[in-house]
């Protein structure tokens, strides 16, 4: 029986899991919808919902707490200026997880995790390497 065991290890060290969820949280805040495996999506949801709850209260202290977890100043700014006010009146339940079939290579169950009232235009925005103009 697995009583009192919470969360999954994903065959990673604690530091690797922490970094993985920080990166996935930043990606979800940036694009407002990501595709990942179902177990990762299930473990990512409480992490992101706690960040959104922090984003509803804009103070120096909550910004520092969010920065300690996200490690991305632009995503912290979006969390407090866009997402926090958007979910100000909602008492939780900011994310939804929808099953998205199975991955081709290893048949792993996939899921789409997204914000409930997401901005449709945010998906894929500013993704990929930045374009640097050559001054030749």
UniProtKB/Swiss-Prot annotation:
Keywords annotated in UniProt: Ribonucleoprotein, Ribosomal protein
InterPro entries in alphabetical order: Ribosomal_bL17 (IPR000456), Ribosomal_bL17_CS (IPR047859), Ribosomal_bL17_sf (IPR036373)
SUPFAM superfamilies associated with the record: Prokaryotic ribosomal protein L17
A GO cellular component annotation in the UniProt record: cytosolic large ribosomal subunit
Coiled coil: none
Pfam families (alphabetical): Ribosomal_L17
MF GO annotations: structural constituent of ribosome
Gene Ontology BP term (one): translation
Keyword NADP in record: no
Binding partners and assembly: Part of the 50S ribosomal subunit. Contacts protein L32.
Family: Belongs to the bacterial ribosomal protein bL17 family.
Protein name as annotated: Large ribosomal subunit protein bL17
Gene: rplQ
């Amino acid at each position: 029986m697995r009583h009192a065991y919470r969360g999954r290890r994903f065959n990673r060290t604690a530091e690797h899991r922490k970094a993985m969820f920080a990166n996935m949280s930043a990606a979800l805040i940036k694009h407002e919808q990501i595709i990942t495996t179902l177990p990762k999506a299930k473990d990512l949801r409480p992490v992101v919902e706690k960040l959104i709850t922090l984003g509803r209260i804009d103070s120096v202290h909550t910004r520092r707490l969010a920065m300690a977890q996200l490690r991305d100043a632009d995503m912290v700014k979006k969390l407090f200026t866009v997402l926090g006010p958007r979910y100000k009146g909602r008492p939780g339940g900011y994310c939804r997880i929808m099953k998205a079939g199975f991955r081709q290579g290893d048949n792993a169950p996939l899921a789409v995790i997204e914000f409930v009232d997401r901005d449709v235009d945010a998906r894929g925005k500013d993704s990929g390497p930045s374009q640097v103009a050559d001054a030749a």
